[in-house]
């Protein structure tokens, strides 16, 4: 009993001090998707890419390197350097201009007149460089996802 009375305050102090330290926030890879695709005169695509931060802390994104594959065609490279601070469990966008292949442009044109009834599958994958809130150095996070885009009714050359 005497031994318990002597060490109990020390144990309680240890538990209290352990609870006072900063909690480590969980860090998860982001999701990247096409928020909007606009066809510019001359055939260039203007992509609005959404970067979704799935982590419990802010992430400071600085670059993206990956590929976009449309309708099982040959993928095209995506690369962008930028500065984007995305809060925890939130998303933000970057804009990127790319020159699609002829086959990609034809696949997109095939669904243009169908409005929201037509859709085109795509796959986007690669890595994004970001610095998590509680870390000193940026690191690379892999991402991969598939989705569909379709023409926006009444807005020519725009797909979501």
Description of each model-found segment:
Residues 27, 39-79, 130, 134-141:
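Post-signal-peptide N-terminal segment of Sec-exported extracytoplasmic proteins
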Residues 21-24:
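Bacterial signal peptide processing site
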Residues 33-44, 52-60, 85-88, 111-118:
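Short, solvent-exposed beta-strand/turn "edge" segments of beta-rich domains on protein surfaces
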Residues 16-19:
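C-terminal motif of bacterial Sec signal peptides marking the signal peptidase cleavage site
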Residues 71-107:
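Intrinsically disordered, low-complexity Pro/Gly/Ser/Thr-rich segments with frequent PxxP/GP/PP motifs
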Residues 31, 46-50, 65-67, 83, ...:
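Beta-strand secondary-structure signal
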Residues 1-8:
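Bacterial N-terminal signal peptides that target proteins for export
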Residues 102-157:
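Terminal connector regions
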């Amino acid at each position: 009993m005497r031994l318990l009375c002597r060490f109990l305050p020390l144990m309680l102090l240890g538990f209290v001090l352990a609870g006072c330290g900063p909690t480590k926030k969980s860090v998860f890879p982001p999701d990247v998707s096409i928020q909007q695709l606009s066809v510019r005169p001359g055939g260039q695509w203007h992509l609005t890419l959404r970067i979704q931060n799935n982590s419990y802390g802010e992430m400071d994104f600085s670059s993206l390197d990956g590929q976009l594959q449309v309708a099982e065609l040959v993928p095209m490279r995506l690369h962008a350097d930028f500065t984007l601070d995305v809060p925890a469990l939130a998303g933000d966008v970057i804009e990127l201009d790319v020159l699609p292949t002829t086959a990609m442009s034809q696949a997109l044109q095939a669904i243009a007149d169908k409005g929201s009834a037509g859709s085109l599958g795509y796959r986007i994958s690669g890595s994004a460089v970001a610095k998590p809130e509680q870390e000193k150095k940026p690191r690379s996070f892999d991402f991969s996802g598939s989705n569909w885009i379709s023409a926006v009714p009444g807005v020519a050359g725009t797909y979501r």
